[in-house]
């Protein structure tokens, strides 16, 4: 809709417009392409080995492909009027700064549901204005997001004390190695399944794990109890990953245990439980994770959020102002 509005505004002024939409993951590129197709907007791709049609007025490109030696010359020759960045909380990275430098006259629009960074770095060096959407509670009250029930560990629980004592690294978040040493054991993993069995048994959902080993062990645990669960991460081959996602959307898999795959852009509205098994100090990551379960679809009443690592005790409920 936004792209159509931009194109139509230029048409009224009898001008052509060229738009670049930038993403950082293949899954996001495919989802944006599907949305553009739904609105009848012709577009090309700048990503990997895909055939390029640079004459099309709308291009969807991955940030890494845009700056490769192979594409750099052709990209520089384009005269983009607009650069739209999806998941724009990443746009302070050097790669995006470099891309923006190639098109100093282009208008830039960053879109994100989580405009915060752990290092508190400001976005004002890139964007002049911040347009704030309503709070999550508004979207829930207006039936645009799903309502939820939230189940968390207690503030004085053993797991919460372990989280509070976990090592914090220079990024401002917990050390993955320390989290793995502390939480990737049979006793604590069994608590994940126990809470699933009590509050979300039979539901379709996503679990957020610390690392690949943690994800694999959780998937194995759930599978041993008859739950159709599989682990997925960034090293899962793209074709296998797509097969797993399709099987999940079709209901052939009930639970996907992931590592940093479904924090952004993943759209499967009938997900009706989320399980948090990875501690974090990042508010953005917290909201991205629970947000995967808040999409609405006909027949969906509520999402169950199982917080097994006490993120509620850091951030409150997802719909808090």
Regions found by a protein language model. Name each.
Residues 1-6, 208, 232, 257:
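Walker A/P-loop
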Residues 89-151:
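Post-DEXD/H (motif II) to motif III coupling segment of the RecA-like Helicase ATP-binding lobe
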Residues 64-65, 234-320:
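Conserved RecA-like P-loop NTPase helicase motor core
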Residues 2-5, 10-11, 15-38, 95, ...:
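Conserved Walker A/P-loop ATP-binding site and its immediately adjacent core
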Residues 30, 44-55, 71, 216-220, ...:
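Conserved helicase ATPase core of P-loop NTP-dependent helicases/translocases
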Residues 130-206:
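Conserved interdomain linker/interface between the two RecA-like ATPase lobes of SF2 helicase motors
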Residues 17-29, 178-225:
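Conserved strand-helix element at the start of the C-terminal RecA-like helicase core
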Residues 48-82, 93-98:
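Conserved helix/coil segment N-terminal to the catalytic DExD/H
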């Amino acid at each position: 809709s936004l792209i159509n509005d931009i194109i139509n505004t230029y048409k009224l002024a009898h001008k052509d417009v060229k738009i670049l939409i930038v993403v950082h993951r293949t899954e996001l590129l495919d989802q944006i392409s599907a949305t553009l197709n739904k609105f009848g907007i012709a577009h090309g791709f700048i990503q990997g080995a895909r055939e390029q049609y640079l004459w099309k007025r709308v291009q969807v490109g991955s940030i890494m492909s845009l700056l490769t030696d192979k594409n750099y010359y052709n990209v520089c020759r384009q005269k983009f009027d607009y650069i739209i960045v999806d998941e724009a909380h990443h746009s302070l990275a050097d790669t995006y700064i470099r891309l923006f430098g190639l098109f100093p006259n282009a208008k830039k629009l960053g879109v994100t549901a989580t405009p915060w960074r752990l290092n508190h770095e400001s976005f004002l060096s890139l964007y002049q204005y911040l347009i704030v959407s309503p709070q999550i509670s508004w979207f829930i009250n207006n039936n645009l997001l799903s309502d939820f029930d939230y189940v968390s560990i207690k503030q004085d629980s053993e797991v919460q004390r372990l989280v509070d004592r976990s090592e914090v690294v220079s990024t401002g978040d917990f050390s993955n190695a320390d989290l793995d040493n502390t939480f990737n054991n049979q006793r604590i993993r069994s608590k994940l399944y126990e809470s699933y069995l009590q509050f979300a048994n039979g539901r379709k959902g996503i679990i957020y794990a610390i690392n690949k080993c943690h994800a694999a062990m959780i998937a194995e645990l759930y599978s041993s109890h008859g739950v159709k669960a599989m682990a997925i991460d960034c090293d899962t081959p793209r074709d296998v990953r797509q097969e797993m996602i399709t099987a999940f959307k079709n209901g052939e898999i009930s639970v996907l245990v992931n590592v940093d795959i479904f924090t952004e852009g993943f759209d499967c509205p009938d997900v009706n439980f989320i399980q948090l098994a990875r501690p974090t100090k990042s508010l953005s990551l917290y909201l991205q994770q629970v947000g995967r379960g808040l999409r609405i679809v006909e027949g969906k009443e509520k999402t169950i959020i199982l917080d097994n690592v006490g993120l509620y005790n850091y951030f409150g409920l997802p719909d808090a102002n």
